[in-house]
């Protein structure tokens, strides 16, 4: 049995920098991805148009075939003037991180109100606001409540800027799914591959399953699967593949991030097949993200072929990076046509 679909549109990737960048970029195409939206949380974060374009150049020198879309890191430097310049240069969006909630988020946001003029400029130019939807860490919040407590802010931003395209990144709860559904067509949500597999018990026992936002309950996992397989265009694929050195994953606490990039299409096909919804995979992983980001659906790039042919996920790839579910057998093998 085989399935031929366009190369995936992965609307949330972490490629890192320096030697890690060189190791990770080749795994994007290996995972069946032909369009990748790149996150800006480097050290230092990508806050200027020039830095963003230089980063894009570095990536494309390593892989000229994949289409890489770029983003800025929301900061006090992200003025309306910067937005106008970024839009002219083809930068697609701005990523918002809650201060201190995840990898390289120390420069993140504590309040959105100072950025209202920036959001107005983004609404005007069609740039996308990508939100890591958790409230900042505090004594009143836990990793389990951080996303639900953020959702009123999402609804408020949507009401204030109804034409601003907003993506609630890496949804992890049933509440997040319902919040995205409750908003108009300008609001969407990405869903990762690994959150379709994981619940709380998985990451508590395995550092390679630990990420931010953390995986939640079985009820939440089922809500994500139902959203991903529903053919609802408000939900599309964003892997949030986040590589870290093995040493960083084995420390206490482990670095937050799951590395799915090399086998992205295979991980997705596994879940969609088990749900009897392979018919929905193309929409979720190839079509809806492209449409939301206004990427032409001409599919000039090659297709991928998913063949029901078992293989074992290697223990490590790309300079000793440990992929999601190492040594486990997957039933769907991905190759380029």
Curated annotation (Swiss-Prot):
Cofactor binding description: Binds 2 Zn(2+) ions per subunit.
Source superkingdom: Eukaryota
GO molecular function terms listed in the Swiss-Prot or TrEMBL record: dihydroorotase activity; metal ion binding
InterPro entries: Amidohydro-rel (IPR006680), DHOdimr (IPR004721), Dihydroorotase_CS (IPR002195), Metal_Hydrolase (IPR032466)
Residues carrying N6-carboxylysine: 95
Cofactor(s) the record lists: Zn(2+)
Reactions listed under catalytic activity: (S)-dihydroorotate + H2O = N-carbamoyl-L-aspartate + H(+)
GO cellular component, one term: nucleus
Pathway: Pyrimidine metabolism; UMP biosynthesis via de novo pathway; (S)-dihydroorotate from bicarbonate: step 3/3
Assigned EC number: 3.5.2.3
Matching Gene3D superfamilies: Metal-dependent hydrolases
GO biological process, one term: 'de novo' pyrimidine nucleobase biosynthetic process
Residues where Zn(2+) 1 binds: 12, 14, 95, 240
Entry binding sites for Zn(2+) 2: 95, 132, 170
Keyword terms of this UniProt record: Hydrolase, Metal-binding, Pyrimidine biosynthesis, Zinc
HAMAP family (UniProt xref): PyrC_classII
Family: Belongs to the metallo-dependent hydrolases superfamily. DHOase family. Class II DHOase subfamily.
PANTHER family registered for this protein in UniProt: DIHYDROOROTASE
Record protein name field: Probable dihydroorotase
Organism: Schizosaccharomyces pombe (strain 972 / ATCC 24843)
Gene that this polypeptide is encoded by: ura2
């Amino acid at each position: 049995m085989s399935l031929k679909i366009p190369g995936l549109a992965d609307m949330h990737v972490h490629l890192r920098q320096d030697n890690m960048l060189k190791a990770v970029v080749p795994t994007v195409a290996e995972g069946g991805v032909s369009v990748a939206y790149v996150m800006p949380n480097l050290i230092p974060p990508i806050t200027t148009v020039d830095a963003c374009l230089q980063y894009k150049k570095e990536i494309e020198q390593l892989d000229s075939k994949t289409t890489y879309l770029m983003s800025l890191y929301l900061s006090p430097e992200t003025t309306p003037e910067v937005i106008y310049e970024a839009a002219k240069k083809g930068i697609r969006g701005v990523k918002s991180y809650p201060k201190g909630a995840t990898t390289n988020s120390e420069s993140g946001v504590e309040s959105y109100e100072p950025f209202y003029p920036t959001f107005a400029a983004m609404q005007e130019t069609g740039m996308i606001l990508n939100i890591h939807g958790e409230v900042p860490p505090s004594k009143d919040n836990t990793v389990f409540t951080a996303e639900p407590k953020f959702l009123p802010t999402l609804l408020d931003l949507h009401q204030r800027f109804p034409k601003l395209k907003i993506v609630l990144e890496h949804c992890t709860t049933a509440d997040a799914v319902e919040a995205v559904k409750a908003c108009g067509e300008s609001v969407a949500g990405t869903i990762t591959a690994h959150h379709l597999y994981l619940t709380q018990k998985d990451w508590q026992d395995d550092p390679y399953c630990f990420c931010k936002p953390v995986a939640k309950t079985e009820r939440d996992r089922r809500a994500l699967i139902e959203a991903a397989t529903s053919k609802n265009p408000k939900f599309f694929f964003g892997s949030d593949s986040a590589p870290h050195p093995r040493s960083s994953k084995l420390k206490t606490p482990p670095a937050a991030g799951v590395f799915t990039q090399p086998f992205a299409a295979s991980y997705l096909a596994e879940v969609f097949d088990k749900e009897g919804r392979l018919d929905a995979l193309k929409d979720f992983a190839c079509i809806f993200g492209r449409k939301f980001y206004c990427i032409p659906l001409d599919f000039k790039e090659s297709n991928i072929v998913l063949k029901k042919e078992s293989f074992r996920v290697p223990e490590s790839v790309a300079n000793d990076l440990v992929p999601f579910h190492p040594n486990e057998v997957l039933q769907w093998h991905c190759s380029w046509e």
